[in-house]
Amino acid sequence: MSMALAVCSFATPAAAYSLQGDTATDNTGIEPTDGLTAGRPVIHTRGDGVKPPAELGNPSEWGVVKIEINDSAARPLGNTCKEVTHGTWCYGWESAGSNGKKCYSNYLADTGHLTTVRVRNIDYSSGWVPKNKTSYANVTIGLAYTCYAYYNNA
């Protein structure tokens, strides 16, 4: 059975919380976005010393990737899918025509989950999605900005 993750859907804004992401190496109290390299996802597990964003709650596993969107039409690392513990996480950006560029985070998982994208300290969340369904989070804002894409498992 093959499954495909769609790259588009609607997401609603959620409250802004702390930015997240970094290598998990018993670094209690680190700022989670410190040291993120654009296009390189970091996966965390509960108790690894990096606190997830408040919106994610206390997930067993969560991931973050920094996506730098510039005004070029070229899309290095524009769309990527990664196999993670409970499913397939896809993230990246695509053209939204005259509206700018859309940053997205989609996730198909065998457990309850959600996806979120963060731009300018505002979170756009898919909300909780049941197992074996795909979550979709995205935002379209201009031609050049930095976006953080997240997924998490219940």
Describe each model-derived feature in a short phrase:
Residues M1-E83:
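N-terminal prepro-regions of secreted/extracellular proteins
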Residues E68-A154:
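Mature secreted bioactive peptide module from preproproteins
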